[in-house]
């Protein structure tokens, strides 16, 4: 694969649709445009034309758009051919482009070229895929903020502050024998604290964005017939799981995605845990335990009329250590006066009293889930769509900055101090792609859809 040849791909989803788009990018597209569209469209103006195959037979009639370099998505010449969105028509139109000299684009190659041509930085490029994959409105808003450069601008601000500070520190090293004070101790302390505060704000916004992107996985566990499926249906707002009076009805894991304040919640209704000789039910319980291992939060449902039983205690004892846990006391509609719900973020535990039948206490459960994951609505409104690699880079930058702060007052440790600043800057620069290995770029863009 080269980065200067002509590439083409169907840019719209597979299947039938009113409109389908074939996108072409590269150099000297006039020849291809003449062969396929019969004309070279006027830049940035829609041209109605007939599309033809390699034997000059008419494939379709549609719109051709031409964007000259560098005023295009990729920074190269771009030709977009809009035809009727049937699979046969789109495949014929793509084949015509390939026979005219293009090759099939790799997944994410259009956006990769936009990155390589400085139309987008790496964080913005990733936000393109995140915007396409957004499962909630808030996640989509968060992704567009990153695409517009808000995340990148915040990173650039911290990188520039580190660059300015490094310049003064490096000057002190280069002219250590001269009686010149390039930066005072007070100024150094002020700048370090300012950068630290900047990083904390960026990390907080990025973490909120990560919740919007990844969501949270929640396993509903408990003994048979305590209301797990009823609670799933109540949270989902529809009947997605069968509810009966017969214990052991749920044999497999049922997954349902809901959103609470824009945060995707992946609910996993599991088979009830109990002693049984039923082979199929045993298989369901084995899947339940596997699901628990993958979950971020476990909702342990118990019957509020009897409280936590020895069987429930056995389930609690089998949970992985450190797992966030909410004990959901269900069927409060059968109690005269249920206790108040409590949430402890310090211990990552909560006791919530609900009625899956009437909906009482469901609001408290939803808020408890948000508190448990550390969701902050005020921060979420300005969140950046962040991936795990972004959080890892920010964490590394914070670690190196803390190490630099610890060395700031050691006159004989100036070189180590300067190195920690450099490493912090390097970690931040990897987010926007100012410093990124080729294998990282390949990993990122390979996850895009073809045609983007």
UniProtKB/Swiss-Prot annotation:
GO terms for biological process: tRNA methylation; tRNA wobble uridine modification. NCBIfam families: mnmE_trmE_thdF (TIGR00450), PRK05291.1-3 (NF003661), small_GTP (TIGR00231). GTP binds at residues 225-230, 244-250, 269-272. Binds 1 potassium ion per subunit. It comes from Nitrosospira multiformis (strain ATCC 25196 / NCIMB 11849 / C 71). Mg(2+) binds at residues 229, 250. Homodimer. Heterotetramer of two MnmE and two MnmG subunits. Pfam families: MMR_HSR1, MnmE_helical, TrmE_N. K(+) binds at residues 225, 244, 246, 249. It is an enzyme of class 3 (hydrolase). Its EC number is 3.6.-.-. Its main location: cytoplasm. Gene3D superfamilies: P-loop containing nucleotide triphosphate hydrolases, Probable tRNA modification gtpase trme, domain 1, tRNA modification GTPase MnmE domain 2. One of its GO terms (molecular function) is metal ion binding. This is tRNA modification GTPase MnmE. It is found in: Cytoplasm. The lineage of its organism: Bacteria, Pseudomonadati, Pseudomonadota, Betaproteobacteria, Nitrosomonadales. One of its GO terms (cellular component) is cytosol.
């Amino acid at each position: 694969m080269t980065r200067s040849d002509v590439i083409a791909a169907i840019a719209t989803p597979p299947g039938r649709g009113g409109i389908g788009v074939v996108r072409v990018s590269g150099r000297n597209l006039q020849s291809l445009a003449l062969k396929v569209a019969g004309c070279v469209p006027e830049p940035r103006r829609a041209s109605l034309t007939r599309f033809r195959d390699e034997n000059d037979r008419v494939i379709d009639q549609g719109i051709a758009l031409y964007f000259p370099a560098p005023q295009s998505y990729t920074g190269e010449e771009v030709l977009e051919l809009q035809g009727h969105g049937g699979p046969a028509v789109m495949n014929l139109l793509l084949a015509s482009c390939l026979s005219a000299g293009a090759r099939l684009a790799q997944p994410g190659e259009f956006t990769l070229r936009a990155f390589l041509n400085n139309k987008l930085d790496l964080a913005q490029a990733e936000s393109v895929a995140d915007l396409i994959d957004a499962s909630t409105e808030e996640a989509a808003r968060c992704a567009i903020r990153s695409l517009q450069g808000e995340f990148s601008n915040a990173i650039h601000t911290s990188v520039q502050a580190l660059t300015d500070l490094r310049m003064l520190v490096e000057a002190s090293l280069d002219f250590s024998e001269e009686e010149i004070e390039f930066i005072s101790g007070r100024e150094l302390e002020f700048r370090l604290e300012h950068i630290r505060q900047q990083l904390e704000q960026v990390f907080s916004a990025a973490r909120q964005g990560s919740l919007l992107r990844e969501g949270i996985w929640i396993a509903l566990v408990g003994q048979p017939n305590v209301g797990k499926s009823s609670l799933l249906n109540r949270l989902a707002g529809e009947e997605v799981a069968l509810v009966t009076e017969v214990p052991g009805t749920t044999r497999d894991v049922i997954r349902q995605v809901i959103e609470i304040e824009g945060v995707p919640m992946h609910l996993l209704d599991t088979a009830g845990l109990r002693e049984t000789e039923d082979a199929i039910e045993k298989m369901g319980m084995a899947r339940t335990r596997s699901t628990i291992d993958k979950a971020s939060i476990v909702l342990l449902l118990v019957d509020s009329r009897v409280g936590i039983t020895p069987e429930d205690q056995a389930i609690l004892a089998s949970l992985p250590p450190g797992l966030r846990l909410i004990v959901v006391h269900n069927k409060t509609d059968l109690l005269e006066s249920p206790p108040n719900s409590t949430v402890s973020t310090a211990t990552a535990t909560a006791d919530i009293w609900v009625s899956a039948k009437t909906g009482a206490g469901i609001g408290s459960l939803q808020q408890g889930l948000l508190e448990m994951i550390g969701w902050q609505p005020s921060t979420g409104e300005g969140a950046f769509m962040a991936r795990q690699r972004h959080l890892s880079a920010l964490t590394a930058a914070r670690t190196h900055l803390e190490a630099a702060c610890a060395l700031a007052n050691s006159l004989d440790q100036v070189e180590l101090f300067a190195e920690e600043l450099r490493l912090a800057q390097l970690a931040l620069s990897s987010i926007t792609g100012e410093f990124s290995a080729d294998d990282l770029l390949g990993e990122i863009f390979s996850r895009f859809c073809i045609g983007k």
